[in-house]
Each structure stands twice: as structure tokens, then as C-alpha cells.
Swiss-Prot record:
Protein name as catalogued: UPF0246 protein Psyr_1064
InterPro entries: YaaA
Gene Ontology cellular component terms for the protein in this record: cytosol
GO biological process: response to hydroperoxide
Similarity remark: Belongs to the UPF0246 family.
Length: 259
């Protein structure tokens, strides 16, 4: 089973990594192509394109300017340990053992607007480039056009390396839209996490993102390769709901949201 998750806007390049092991991103030639284009933008243009404050636009202009694909532990960090959003709060990668990191390296991928597809131990430098950014480029009007079918092809390669054809989608709609379902040689399992609020079950973004991270960790800890085994996920009150689920869409409900 191969899992895909979204990246995060929040990054942590201050905390030392919990492992000294790392790999290099596999598709840096494509990243360099984007960086070359982004370097031509002024901070004001970055602000308008990405809807950022002047301060954040200036920060990311500087990041694009200093980006260097010769990644080391001195100028980069392992992707799974660098991202610090709600998904990664649920995943708690900093507490994974070396053996669990090994398993994650083979079974988890992070979608990325700049890097395309990252393995957990792939080094990355800080950036901000959401997949939904409408950055016109030589391949089309936005990043979906830029990546085209490449991400799907790379996922197919990763699945072939595993000898598997099962893809667990734990990414947001924005990011999984960069995966061309028709190009995947895989059975896709989608997930939904709903909390009870105001008399009904609904997807609450913060909780759903955290739950995707918790599900990722559950798969890593239990080394799950059977989709039916995913139904046992019961972390922090979530329970599989058979009535709302289908074989290819697993729905988990929780009656009391966390404070």
C-alpha cells in the first residue's frame, strides 16, 4: 500500500532532525525549472500571485533566490520532519523509530507544488508554492498543467517497486487533483473523517487534516497492506462507519470533537 498526503504551509527548519539519514528528491530538474521562473518575479508579483502579505512575499522571494539543489543537512531538512501543519501534528513524525521511518520511506509520499512528489527522507529547502497556484508556465496555465501526468507516472513506479496496486489517498482535494486518476495503475482508496457538530456529521477541516496524519501513522505502525484492515482505525474517537462507506471510500465518524 502506498499513501499520499499533502504538504504544509508551516515549516520547521529550526529543530534538529531526529535522524541523520536522508535521500535526495528524485525530480529536482523540474523543481529547478519552476525556481528559474519564480526568481523572475518581484516580491509584489509573488504577493499578488500567492495572496501573501508583503512580509511573506519578501521571505519567499528570498527563498527562491537562495534555493540551491545541492542539498545537505546543513542547508536542507528531511521533508517529513520539515513540514509542520495539521496533518503532521497528527502524524508526529518526530517520534517515529528508525524502523518506522524505513517503512514510511517505502510507503508514504508527499505531494508538492515545487517538488512534485517527495519521499519522507528526501531533503528539501524551505518554500511556499501551493499546488493550486495559477503560475502560468511553458506547459500551461497552472501547476496542474506543469506536472501533467508526471506525478501519476511516478506513483505508478513506486507501486511497481512495491509489487502493489493500492493507493491510499490521504491528501486534500487541491493536492490530489495533481494526480491523474485515469493514468494510475492502481486501486484508489479515498477517505473521509467527519465530526458531529450542530446535529450532523460534517468534515471540519482542522480535525480532518489531523485525522489524515493519524491514519498515516496508523498504517506505518501497523504495516497495513490490506484495505479492510484500515477499518480498525480508531484513534482519538474515530470509528469506521459501514453505512456511509463503500469499498473504495472509507468514512470515519467521531461523536465528540476535541477541544
Amino acid at each position: 500500500m502506498l499513501m499520499v498526503i499533502s504538504p504544509a504551509k508551516t515549516l520547521d527548519f529550526e529543530t534538529p532532525p531526529t535522524t541523520g539519514r536522508f535521500t535526495q528528491p528524485q525530480y529536482l530538474d523540474h523543481s529547478q525549472e519552476l525556481i528559474d521562473q519564480l526568481r523572475e518575479l518581484t516580491p509584489a508579483q509573488i504577493s499578488e500571485l500567492m495572496h501573501l502579505s508583503d512580509k511573506l512575499a519578501g521571505l519567499n522571494a528570498a527563498r527562491f533566490g537562495s534555493w540551491n539543489p545541492d542539498f545537505t543537512l546543513d542547508n536542507a531538512k528531511q521533508a517529513l520532519l520539515a513540514f509542520k501543519g495539521d496533518v503532521y501534528t497528527g502524524l508526529e513524525a518526530e517520534t517515529l523509530s528508525e524502523a518506522q521511518l524505513d517503512y514510511a520511506q517505502g510507503h508514504l509520499r508527499m505531494l508538492s507544488g515545487l517538488y512534485g512528489l517527495l519521499r519522507p527522507l528526501d531533503l528539501m529547502q524551505p518554500y511556499r508554492l501551493e499546488m493550486g497556484t495559477r503560475l502560468a508556465n511553458a506547459r500551461g496555465k497552472d501547476l496542474y498543467a506543469f506536472w501533467g501526468t508526471r506525478i501519476s507516472e511516478w506513483l505508478n513506479e513506486a507501486l511497481a517497486d512495491q509489487g502493489d496496486d493500492l493507493l491510499l489517498n490521504l491528501a486534500s482535494t487541491e493536492y490530489f487533483s495533481a494526480v491523474k486518476r485515469s493514468s494510475l495503475k492502481a486501486r484508489i482508496i479515498d477517505t473521509e473523517f467527519k465530526d458531529f457538530k450542530n446535529g450532523q456529521y460534517k468534515i471540519i477541516s482542522f480535525y480532518a487534516k489531523k485525522a489524515r496524519g493519524m491514519m498515516s501513522r496508523f498504517v506505518i505502525e501497523e504495516r497495513i497492506n490490506d484495505p479492510e484492515a484500515l477499518q480498525a482505525f480508531d484513534v482519538q474517537g474515530y470509528r469506521y462507519n459501514r453505512e456511509q462507506s463503500t469499498p473504495d471510500k472509507l468514512v470515519f465518524l467521531r461523536n465528540i470533537a476535541e477541544d
